């Protein structure tokens, strides 16, 4: 599980990803976001808990702004995937309508430094 935090702006960070990272990071982002939902009690998400104690997964669920950053980044990685490969990534199709909502009771705090 990784987050390639290449820019503070999640859109810019998505645009500068290597092709292989665009493909893989959409799935990993979706898994971390689903894990955040499960951590806060919402089990109605497409992916099972994955790497619960990995620093990137912990960062994702730390607060609402971290979660929103990764969700926005994942969606723009999806846009990059579509531009580069001419199709929609399956994880975007499976997850966007669920993951666009914050997990219940996630703390409302400022965006925190990412754990590298």
Where is each model-derived feature located?
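An N-terminal structural lobe/cap that precedes and organizes the functional/catalytic core
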Residues: 1-82
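Charge-dense polyanion-binding interfaces
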Residues: 68-103
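Conserved NAD+-utilizing ADP-ribose enzyme module
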Residues: 104-112
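Conserved small/polar residues in nucleotide/adenosyl-binding loops
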Residues: 114-116
């Amino acid at each position: 599980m990784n987050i390639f935090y290449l820019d503070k702006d999640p859109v810019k960070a998505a645009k500068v990803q290597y092709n292989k990272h665009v493909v893989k990071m959409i799935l990993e982002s979706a898994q971390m976001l689903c894990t955040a939902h499960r951590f806060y009690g919402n089990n109605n998400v497409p992916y099972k808990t994955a790497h619960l104690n990995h620093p990137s997964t912990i960062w994702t669920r730390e607060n609402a702004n971290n979660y929103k950053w990764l969700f926005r980044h994942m969606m723009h990685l999806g846009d990059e995937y579509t531009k580069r490969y001419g199709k929609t990534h399956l994880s975007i199709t499976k997850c966007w309508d669920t993951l666009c909502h914050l997990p219940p009771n996630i703390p409302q705090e400022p965006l925190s430094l990412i754990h590298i």
